[in-house]
């Protein structure tokens, strides 16, 4: 198991994540797991839900450092120039929304298919949500989940990537250093601090 009790957000071994009782494991059983990040959420009290985590996460993205927002803008400009993000008629048929069971739909607290930032929501349960993104480079999935700990909660951000052509792996390899060294660590620090500020715990450095 990953050791990081005194650290802020850190990457987690996939095996540690897979033992968590999440719907995403079965739902995405045939989709490669790219990486997993743990987010330490100190405080918060009982009864917090994934919607609370999502709200702080969105605020963390919006408050990301200039280098991170600059990288995001650069990716969007390149995507617009090369047509990566232009929606194609056939992509709807590839959406994993068609995998949702009647139970998934009944238990989701938000309607499948609604926008979730630049992604599309598949389901949102009390402690877990899953969204997808289909563009010209990847068919990606973002799993956000949480579990209680003695001092608050531990959230997991897991990224799954289904290749859409041979370019997908090259693309993911090219952006991996930026994602893993700059983007995710910076956003996760903002999320952890934002959670501490919102719920009255100032121990996050």
Predicted feature locations:
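Hydrophobic-ligand binding "helix-grip"
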Residues: 106-149
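Hydrophobic ligand-binding cavity/cleft-lining segments
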Residues: 2-107
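A conserved amphipathic terminal alpha-helix motif
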Residues: 172-201
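Short hydrophobic helices that act as membrane-entry/anchoring signals
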Residues: 69-80, 168-176, 180-183
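Beta-strand/loop substructures that line and gate deep hydrophobic ligand-binding cavities in soluble
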Residues: 135-173
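Intrinsic-disorder/low-complexity, polar/charged segments enriched in Ser/Thr/Lys/Arg/Asp/Glu/Gln
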Residues: 34-38, 128, 154-156
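Hydrophobic side chains in beta-strands
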Residues: 39-41, 133, 159
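Active-site-proximal cofactor/substrate-binding loop regions of enzyme domains
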Residues: 204
